[in-house]
Amino acid sequence: MTDPVYRRVVIKLSGEYLAGQQGFGIDQPTVDRVADDLIAARHLGTEVAVVIGGGNIVRGVEVSSRGVSRPTGDTMGMLATMMNCLALEAAIERKGTPARTLSAFVMPEISELFTRTAAHKYLAEGRIVLLGGGTGNPFFTTDTTAVLRAAEIGAQAVLKATNVDGVYSADPKKDPTATRFDRLTHSQAIEGGYKVMDATAFALARETSLPIIVFSIAEPGSIGAILRGIGHGTIVAG
């Protein structure tokens, strides 16, 4: 078996993906499949931390457009990420692999508070660590959270799992002439306005010299393929 390219990574998953074909909520077969992929990645020898969005339950921006204040809407979204983390943690542990959810919020009855020390400890123990609650502050996306947490815990890369196999010049579902980039710099990603991640996330990755690999999670085993250096995606670095 090929040794993994990265010793420690943060994987960014969208909440919408966990909804499966139903489009809302948590689809258990999808959660189980993601859990299988994460477990397989851990078995390669890579230490795996995961940041999940909450858009399958609530999106703060959308809620705020309907009269709720933006900080309150974003807090609702951050709480939704905790639901996703707990669902995925349960699936991983049911399959026999230890996992641990750490929260940006103080909620002792539900989850331990995120600290760098706790994250390092659980990753070193071989657990898959699920990082919920976003940054704990409104106005920041879970993409930015993924880069922030990766920098904090010394991850070597952020793996951004999407429904397309990389960064394209335009939406490939709408524009048949769209071309996929094999590689971009952080600055090119920001200047190009590519919507796969927000500019704040790219800027923080540039500042902390963190590579981001954008890939499709649609095929089972895609995370492991990226970790072995044989996956198909776009590398944003430099």
Swiss-Prot record:
The keyword Nucleotide-binding applies. It is found in: Cytoplasm. GO terms for molecular function: ATP binding; UMP kinase activity. Allosterically activated by GTP. Inhibited by UTP. It comes from the Bacteria. One of its GO terms (cellular component) is cytosol. One of its GO terms (biological process) is UDP biosynthetic process. Pfam families: AA_kinase. Signal peptide: none annotated. UMP binds at G54, D74, T135, G136, N137, P138, F139, F140, T141, T142. It catalyses: UMP + ATP = UDP + ADP. Its EC number is 2.7.4.22. ATP binds at K12, L13, S14, G15, G55, R59, T162, N163, Y168, D171. Its main location: cytoplasm. InterPro entries: AceGlu_kinase-like_sf, Asp/Glu/Uridylate_kinase, Uridylate_kinase, Uridylate_kinase_bac. Keywords: Allosteric enzyme, ATP-binding, Cytoplasm, Kinase, Nucleotide-binding, Pyrimidine biosynthesis, Transferase. Pathway: Pyrimidine metabolism; CTP biosynthesis via de novo pathway; UDP from UMP (UMPK route): step 1/1. CDD domains: AAK_UMPK-PyrH-Ec. Residues 20-25 are annotated as: Involved in allosteric activation by GTP. Catalyzes the reversible phosphorylation of UMP to UDP. Homohexamer. Belongs to the UMP kinase family. This is Uridylate kinase. It comes from Bradyrhizobium diazoefficiens (strain JCM 10833 / BCRC 13528 / IAM 13628 / NBRC 14792 / USDA 110). The lineage of its organism: Bacteria, Pseudomonadati, Pseudomonadota, Alphaproteobacteria, Hyphomicrobiales.
